[in-house]
């Protein structure tokens, strides 16, 4: 077993060796290195063929038409393109957008930017289970609402929103529906033929593909229009200009092909690992699971250890690669805005750790990690005067702390 142990699969995944092999065939002089937009020679034709094959592979995972897949640089760009693209195109119809407080920053900050441009955004608050319900969305809908953006799987707590029910609601009201699915490909079944979803963002690097490539699903029937945000040569039917990176795209296609074929067995494998891990740490007192355990992907376990500071716990677990909050915001020492939105107090939000498991995690690693967590939590609590007070029966919420 190699140390450190990687348990941060929701931050990124390693590229699957089969994906790396396909990518390496699109780089060198004797490989498929051409520009897919070069129409006058065989190098361009071959590259275009590889790109279209990958487009089909991505579409097949989510049961979409390949013509509905637009290549982007990742889910952040896809979120920006979907939300700004719809807002700018349909602003004559209305200027109201609905999203939730627990979306990824790529959605929240895009909405903040639109607010500066004069749009109005309603931010829904989840229940303490971390879920956004159709009833919450319905209550926020207005005559001038043009877009609802709700994530499929939350990146911090792994909860799964009922996008099928939300889609039925938005379609019946003539409102476009965007879903950030960066964390759900290869984890949850997605059928865009059945779902009433108009736009969906995808990322390769959360699904054992390379970083720097993603896609946006844009529905054709009923047709969804978006205004391109990247101007240039008019690639991707004008929705996203820029030379297509054949090697990245081929990597994403292969990653999504593997996800489609191996999803069922992989989810079972990961669920068994998570249950094994949780069974070994469940004996710890004052342990709180963040988010619903029933409507949740098997890959995620987000736990708060009361009376332990999350940052010091991460330092104590130097052989484990885990995170507090999402990778994009874990550098800030603010408590997770997702956990705050669930109603967790600052202490519990600060003491949370996200363990995310994946394709290459082994039982041996799980057992080692669980043992280290139990040891570290117990040791840090021994050093904590708050823990002593709690054990003595002091109600810490009633204590008045003296300011110095």
Curated annotation (Swiss-Prot):
InterPro entries: Aminotrans_V_dom, Aminotrans_V_PyrdxlP_BS, Cys_deSase_IscS, Cysteine_dSase, PyrdxlP-dep_Trfase, PyrdxlP-dep_Trfase_major, PyrdxlP-dep_Trfase_small
Pathway(s) it belongs to: Cofactor biosynthesis; iron-sulfur cluster biosynthesis
Catalytic activity reported: (sulfur carrier)-H + L-cysteine = (sulfur carrier)-SH + L-alanine
Pfam families, A to Z: Aminotran_5 (PF00266)
Domain of life assignment: Bacteria
Active-site residue list: 328
Subcellular localization(s) per the UniProt record: Cytoplasm
Binding site for [2Fe-2S] cluster: 328
Biological process, per Gene Ontology: [2Fe-2S] cluster assembly
Modified residues (N6-(pyridoxal phosphate)lysine): 206
SUPFAM superfamilies: PLP-dependent transferases (SSF53383)
Enzyme Commission code(s) on record: 2.8.1.7
Assigned keywords, A-Z: 2Fe-2S, Cytoplasm, Iron, Iron-sulfur, Metal-binding, Pyridoxal phosphate, Transferase
Family: Belongs to the class-V pyridoxal-phosphate-dependent aminotransferase family. NifS/IscS subfamily.
Its biological purpose: Master enzyme that delivers sulfur to a number of partners involved in Fe-S cluster assembly, tRNA modification or cofactor biosynthesis. Catalyzes the removal of elemental sulfur atoms from cysteine to produce alanine. Functions as a sulfur delivery protein for Fe-S cluster synthesis onto IscU, an Fe-S scaffold assembly protein, as well as other S acceptor proteins.
PANTHER family, A to Z: CYSTEINE DESULFURASE, CYSTEINE DESULFURYLASE FAMILY MEMBER
This protein's name: Cysteine desulfurase IscS
Organism, scientific name: Pseudomonas paraeruginosa (strain DSM 24068 / PA7)
